């Protein structure tokens, strides 16, 4: 990192929403901006909370399972309290530690309660992807854990959720014939369910959705590639992890965003 402060990492004056912003507008903004979180502020720019794509989609999903409401769903119904904030004078290590300790992906930067900016896990990954930090050019192969049992593409979404809970992972590879064809995470599952049209048979239709309809097809890494390349892949495809295969395209394991961020934390002072 070129500086000792957060200035090279923070997105200043980030897009923000109000409590009255509708769910449709929230989802449109998130898709257009390629983000999964938006800060909620009052008229004076004071931070009220954070709204996430996951929370919005879950609320939409609940509405689809019951009779349609007259009033549109708004941010005030899904806004979450802020687990942590930081000031503009903080050091990068403080911000990254807060993100990892709280298991969150975005950290508001405040001054006197007013929103100045946002720093995210992707901002730190991007810094790591430049390959200038110690360890960022290590080979992927030295950082692989024993692979978790992957999913088959014809598994149901419920089976995928159960598998994630059982192994304690928030993402799993989807493998066919020993070769990975994609990755699935909780947000992918919720997105797939919300794509189902409303109607009397919707709940039954949702239960038949297969992992192949929810997964993201992504390029795999080779064991000899560098960790900074893994970070770049995660940023480009907005992934929580990267899949690693051998030359025969056989599944070897996964490398998570949190693993790379943990390495980065140990290097920061």
Located regions from the model:
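Intrinsically disordered, low-complexity regions enriched in small/polar residues
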Residues: 39-40, 130, 173, 253
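Tandem CBS (Bateman) regulatory domains
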Residues: 1-13, 52-83, 96, 100, ...
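Conserved active-site beta-strand-loop modules that form the wall/rim of enzyme catalytic pockets
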Residues: 170-171, 182, 186-187
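The conserved cystathionine-beta-synthase
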Residues: 16-35, 41, 85-103, 110, ...
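Short hydrophobic beta-strand segments in globular cytosolic domains
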Residues: 47-48, 110, 115-116, 175, ...
């Amino acid at each position: 990192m070129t500086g000792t402060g957060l200035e090279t990492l923070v997105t200043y004056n980030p897009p923000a929403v109000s409590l009255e912003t509708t769910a449709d507008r929230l989802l449109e903004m998130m898709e257009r901006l390629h983000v999964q979180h938006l800060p909620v502020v009052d008229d004076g720019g004071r931070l009220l909370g954070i709204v996430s794509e996951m929370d919005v989609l879950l609320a939409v999903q609940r509405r689809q399972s019951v009779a349609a409401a007259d009033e549109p769903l708004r941010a005030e119904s899904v806004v979450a309290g802020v687990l942590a904030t930081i000031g503009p004078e903080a050091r990068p290590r403080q911000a990254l530690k807060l993100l990892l300790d709280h298991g969150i992906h975005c950290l508001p930067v405040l001054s006197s309660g007013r929103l100045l900016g946002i720093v995210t896990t992707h901002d730190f990954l991007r810094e790591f992807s430049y390959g200038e930090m110690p360890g960022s050019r290590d080979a992927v192969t030295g950082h692989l854990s024993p692979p978790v049992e992957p999913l088959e593409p014809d598994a149901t979404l419920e089976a995928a959720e159960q598998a994630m809970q059982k192994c304690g992972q928030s993402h799993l590879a989807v493998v066919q014939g020993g070769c990975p064809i994609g990755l699935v995470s909780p947000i992918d599952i919720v997105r797939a369910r919300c794509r189902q049209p409303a109607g009397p048979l919707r709940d039954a239709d949702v239960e038949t959705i297969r992992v192949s309809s929810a997964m993201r097809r992504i390029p795999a890494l080779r064991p000899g590639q560098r960790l900074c390349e893994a970070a770049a892949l995660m940023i480009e495809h907005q992934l929580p992890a990267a899949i690693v295969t051998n030359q025969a395209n056989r599944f070897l394991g996964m490398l998570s965003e949190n693993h790379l961020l943990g390495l980065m934390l140990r290097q920061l002072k």
